[in-house]
């Protein structure tokens, strides 16, 4: 098992983010929204993170949310399909609600429709 989070697992360029948003394949829950592509042709998943200043004013709060999501991805990337994912944080979460955010992320990433995810076209 490889638990590293190297450069090849990140969406880095604006074009990468734009191509994922162009597919318009999104699912959302209370805290998070996940957009995904149909495939990236690389054989492994990649992730991009969006946490705006409207969500959390302080940089340390935004960094904490990104760190939680990156850590979840790092531990679960071997179970994900080879697609590009963009995770957008809708509502702020902290240490007390991070467990809920991880659970929502698992539901959104593994795409089980019975979990009550709202699909957006």
Swiss-Prot record:
Keywords tagged on the record: Endonuclease, Hydrolase, Nuclease, RNA-binding, tRNA processing
Record-linked Gene3D superfamilies: 3.30.230.10
PROSITE patterns: RIBONUCLEASE_P
A Pfam family that the UniProt record links to this protein: Ribonuclease_P
BP-aspect Gene Ontology terms: tRNA 3'-end processing; tRNA 5'-leader removal
Broad enzyme group: hydrolase
Keyword Chloroplast: no
Keyword tRNA processing: yes
EC number(s) recorded for this UniProt protein: 3.1.26.5
Matching InterPro entries: Ribosomal_Su5_D2-typ_SF, Ribsml_uS5_D2-typ_fold_subgr, RNase_P, RNase_P_CS
GO annotation, cellular component aspect: ribonuclease P complex
Reaction catalyzed: Endonucleolytic cleavage of RNA, removing 5'-extranucleotides from tRNA precursor
Summary of subunit composition and partner proteins: Consists of a catalytic RNA component (M1 or rnpB) and a protein subunit.
Function (record text): RNaseP catalyzes the removal of the 5'-leader sequence from pre-tRNA to produce the mature 5'-terminus. It can also cleave other RNA substrates such as 4.5S RNA. The protein component plays an auxiliary but essential role in vivo by binding to the 5'-leader sequence and broadening the substrate specificity of the ribozyme.
Family to which this protein belongs: Belongs to the RnpA family.
Protein name, per record: Ribonuclease P protein component
Source organism per UniProt: Neisseria meningitidis serogroup B (strain ATCC BAA-335 / MC58)
């Amino acid at each position: 098992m490889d638990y590293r989070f190297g450069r090849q697992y990140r969406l880095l360029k604006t074009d990468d983010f734009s191509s994922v948003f162009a597919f318009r394949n999104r699912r959302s829950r209370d805290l998070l929204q996940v957009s995904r592509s149909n495939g990236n042709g690389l054989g492994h998943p990649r992730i991009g993170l969006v946490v705006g200043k409207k969500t959390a004013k302080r940089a340390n709060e935004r960094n904490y949310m990104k760190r939680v999501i990156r850590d979840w991805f790092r531990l679960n990337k071997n179970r994900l399909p080879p697609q590009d994912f963009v995770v957008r944080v809708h509502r702020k979460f902290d240490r007390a609600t991070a467990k809920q955010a991880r659970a929502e992320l698992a539901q959104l990433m593994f795409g089980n429709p019975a979990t009550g995810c709202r699909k957006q076209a």
